[in-house]
Amino acid sequence: MLKKINKIKDQFISDLNKVKTIEEAEKLKKSLLGKESELSEILKSLKDSDTNDKQAIGIASHELRTFIASTIDEFVARIKKEALDAKLASEKIDVSLTGTLARFGTKHPLNIVVEEITQIFTEIGFDVLNGNDVESDEYCFQKLNLPVGHPARDMQDTFYIDEETVLSTHCTHMTARVLTQMAKDENFEGNYACVAIGNVYRRDDDDATHSHQFMQLDLLCIGKKITFANLKWVLKYMCKRLFGEEVNIRLRPSLFPFTEPSVEVDVSCFKCSGKGCSICKYSGWIEILGSGIINEQVMLLNGMDPEKNTALAFGAGIERIAMLKFGISNIRNLYENNVQFLEQFKFYGE
């Protein structure tokens, strides 16, 4: 009888391998577990049997019934899952949209220049300060040798927020603040160097080379024995680092309220190497900034003793430097957020 049970199991496994559908599986299950199946007949016969294997036959029969039922149930569940997966795959709706390719940002040419200037001067021990957008009339004008009513103020007509506060017309107000701070500092040993970078505002008409708002760099170097030779070295150092070692500078006498002596600084034309072209107006030189030794009166107005300390200074427009460095002909290009224009600087410095 046990051999018969094993034979039924082997036959079931063989038949199940041929089954392809749920209906065929249910039919096979009924034929093996139904009331008239061989297994059912074996179990019925055990009631009147007195064989010694009665218990073993009963256990084997029930185990086979359980095996057949669970195996067919698993088969049916697998067939149903495969059918459902196939149906879902055939009915799948693509709810996605083609993504928009994000543009990689690039450094703005003004930021490139600011970062280069910062590196150039921090390498030789200068501090980097942020200029104030809003400043008092005192530090913007009076402490820089531009008292109330001085005609030179007309060149820097600006917006007054109130009677004592203005939008900064130049970053040189930081020179006044630093000089005043150092004069009050008991620990000041007589030497200090910094550059200040900030936005400035003028009542200028906008055109290809002028803007009512722009960025300015101001340098200040205080020392006990500062001379014009130091100023010339700093100017050459900065210009060669910004525009290349082949660049030369030229100093022309000038007049500024903050400095005495004062000079305008020109650099040799990058395009023609000083030979003369339309860029430099056939002079071979391009004006870039104004500089000089801080006026004794400015030192006194800020609490400094000009007999003990002297200082050099210069001021330059960041936009002016960027336009010369990158060959930009119109200052408006720096403010219009033209992506096509700005992408030109994507790989600068790499």
Swiss-Prot record:
Catalysed transformations (reactions): tRNA(Phe) + L-phenylalanine + ATP = L-phenylalanyl-tRNA(Phe) + AMP + diphosphate + H(+)
Organism classification: Bacteria, Bacillati, Mycoplasmatota, Mollicutes, Entomoplasmatales
Name of the gene this protein is made from: pheS
Keywords assigned: Aminoacyl-tRNA synthetase, ATP-binding, Cytoplasm, Ligase, Magnesium, Metal-binding, Nucleotide-binding, Protein biosynthesis
Gene Ontology cellular-component annotations: cytoplasm
Subunit structure: Tetramer of two alpha and two beta subunits.
Protein name in UniProt: Phenylalanine--tRNA ligase alpha subunit
Keyword ATP-binding: yes
Gene3D superfamilies, A to Z: Bira Bifunctional Protein, Domain 2
The keyword Calcium is assigned to this record: no
